């Protein structure tokens, strides 16, 4: 009995190893924990949560999309393009600005002109095909006539009627063809007889000044202007601007349609005393301020420059230097000491000799009398140390 109690006590004692102890109950894994707020990811269910989702503001839709993962409906970007100019735009305002611009209008006009040319070409081709079909019909009727003479007389009568009709058609066509060159020659003769003023009024363009206007009143105002009149005078040679043929250019040559009579000429403006080499230079000179002021009689404006020609000619002080032709007299022997007198005399002889190439020195500006010998004597006391004499010679 004691042993049983002992063993029972030993089983309950903590001295036994941990392997004998019963295992602890297993813990529940953390994966079994359910989320706190389970929201469905289905877009239809999320939209059902908000019945007015489609009527909401874009900001509210963006917030709901960010929180609940409801994707916004993708809008397809509308592509706006111009097929004529081959351009794409980002908005309607850009497209409207392009359609109102001059670049688009120019391309539209060019496209319409090409279409009109193609229509005229197709009309000419259709006219040619009809003319050729008529000629082939006449040839066929003539061949039928030759065949009908050998056949029955009824067939010959029908063919003669057809031939008469075809001959009438051919005569009408030939008359039209003959009239067309006469009308063309008449139209070509009209521009030859048309004067320059009538042509300018018809085209609203001055071929002399190369100026295009928008109305007849503007053309009259241009013709009454000074620039147009001076260009007319230059062409006629009656004004102050004279035209001369350019050297080295032949007078004979192909006459251009836009010839103004001023090509290959040089011009001289007598008012300004200016020579120009071309028509464009003449136009620039006529429109310059210098020519306008001279033509109006205004005096020329003085040119201010640091180096004026008048200042070069006239000296501001007006001092005149007098040069004497006689050789200068040698220095007095009293001024120079005795050792230097010989050198001064030799220098004077060299200056006065005819073989010397040096010119005579200029006379002094102010003639003064020689200093008296009393002033040239040394002082009574030794004021400073005496220096060696210095010789001043020209060379």
UniProtKB/Swiss-Prot annotation:
Q: Which InterPro entries match?
A: Matrin/U1-like-C_Znf_C2H2, Znf385, Znf_C2H2_sf, Znf_C2H2_type
Q: Give the main localization category.
A: nucleus
Where do the record's region annotations for Disordered lie? Answer: 169-194, 282-309
The subcellular localization recorded is: Nucleus
Task: Kindly give the Pfam families that the UniProt entry links to this protein.
Answer: zf-met (PF12874)
Q: Which UniProt keywords apply?
A: Metal-binding, Nucleus, Repeat, Zinc, Zinc-finger
> What are the residue ranges of zinc fingers typed Matrin-type?
80-110, 204-234, 267-297
Question: What GO cellular-component annotations does this UniProt entry give?
Answer: nucleus
Task: Name any one GO molecular function.
Answer: sequence-specific double-stranded DNA binding
User: In terms of domain of life, where is this protein from?
Assistant: Eukaryota
Q: Where is the composition biased (Polar residues)?
A: 169-193
Question: What is the official name of this protein in its record?
Answer: Zinc finger protein 385D
**Species for this entry:** Homo sapiens (Human)
């Amino acid at each position: 009995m004691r042993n049983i109690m002992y063993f029972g006590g030993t089983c309950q004692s903590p001295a036994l190893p941990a392997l004998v102890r019963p295992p602890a109950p297993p813990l529940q894994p953390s994966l079994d924990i359910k989320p706190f707020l389970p929201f469905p990811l289905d877009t239809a269910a999320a939209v059902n949560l908000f019945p007015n989702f489609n009527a909401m503001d874009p900001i509210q839709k963006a917030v709901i999309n960010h929180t609940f993962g409801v994707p916004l409906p993708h809008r397809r970007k509308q592509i706006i393009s111009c097929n004529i100019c081959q351009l794409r735009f980002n908005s309607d305002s850009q497209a409207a600005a392009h359609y109102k611009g001059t670049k688009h209008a120019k391309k539209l006009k060019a496209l319409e002109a090409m279409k009109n040319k193609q229509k005229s070409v197709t009309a000419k081709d259709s006219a040619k095909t009809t003319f050729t079909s008529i000629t082939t019909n006449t040839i066929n009727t003539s061949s039928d006539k030759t065949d009908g003479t050998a056949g029955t007389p009824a067939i010959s009568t029908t063919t003669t009627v057809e031939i008469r009709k075809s001959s009438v058609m051919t005569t009408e066509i030939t008359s039209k063809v003959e009239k067309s060159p006469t009308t063309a020659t008449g139209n070509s003769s009209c521009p030859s007889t048309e004067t320059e003023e009538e042509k300018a009024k018809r085209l609203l363009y001055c071929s002399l000044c190369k100026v295009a206007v928008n109305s007849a009143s503007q053309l009259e105002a241009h013709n009454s202007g000074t620039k147009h009149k001076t260009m007319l005078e230059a062409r006629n040679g009656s004004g102050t601007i004279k035209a001369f043929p350019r050297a080295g250019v032949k007078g004979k040559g192909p006459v251009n349609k836009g010839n103004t009579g001023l090509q290959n000429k040089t011009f001289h403006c007598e008012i300004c005393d200016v020579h120009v080499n071309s028509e464009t230079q003449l136009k620039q000179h006529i429109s310059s301020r210098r020519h306008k002021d001279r033509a109006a009689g205004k005096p020329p404006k003085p040119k201010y420059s640091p180096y004026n020609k008048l200042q070069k000619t006239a000296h501001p002080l007006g001092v005149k230097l007098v040069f004497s032709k006689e050789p200068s007299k040698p220095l007095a022997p009293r001024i120079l000491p005795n050792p230097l007198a010989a050198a001064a005399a030799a220098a004077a002889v060299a200056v006065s000799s005819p073989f010397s190439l040096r010119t005579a020195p200029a006379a002094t500006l102010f003639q003064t009398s020689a200093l008296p010998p009393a002033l040239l004597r040394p002082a009574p006391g030794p004021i400073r140390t005496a220096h060696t004499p210095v010789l001043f010679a020209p060379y």
